[in-house]
Amino acid sequence: MAFFADQKSDPKRGFRFILSIGGIPAYTIKTVSKPGVTVSTIEHQFLNHTFRYPGRTTWDSPISVTLVDPVDPDVARTLLNKIKNAGYVYPTDPASSQQSMTKDVAVTTLEGCVIEQLSGDGTTAVERWELKNAFLPKVTYGDLDYGSEDLSQITIEITYDWAELRESGPVDPSQALRPERVASSDSEGKSTARG
């Protein structure tokens, strides 16, 4: 029986989702692309025939995320702080040029990345993707336009090594929907929190 003929059956919907990234309020997330996987194919030719074998499995990384940028909490600053906390230093003196990012710190700074697709009542994650070893390789702060009344947007890419699709489970709305404590930077570059 098709799902639309059964009143108890409900298809997964593209607008029912929560993306959890440390320090980023869930309500600022506008769009997210889900993970994908590709298995390469190796061909072997014998006489007049071609036989195909599975090769390496790679995850289609990065995923793309679009966020709106409120004044408070300042998502633009939060994302820049994540890049800086991962090891980036402004090149203001010779000593700063010796510092660079490491994967360990970049992954730790992002504080995890989980995409939850929700049930109709919002209490259950019918699909939960956990991106492993995820970090930010790209942040695009958007465009400004005198002729536009649109909300300011930021686009980020999140790269990862692999993704795990977890079992369905309950969603804790107090964690998913509340404005998280957002890190900001004071004039001396020290990380503070507000929220």
Model-flagged regions — what are they?
Residues 1-195:
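Glycine-rich, low-complexity intrinsically disordered segments
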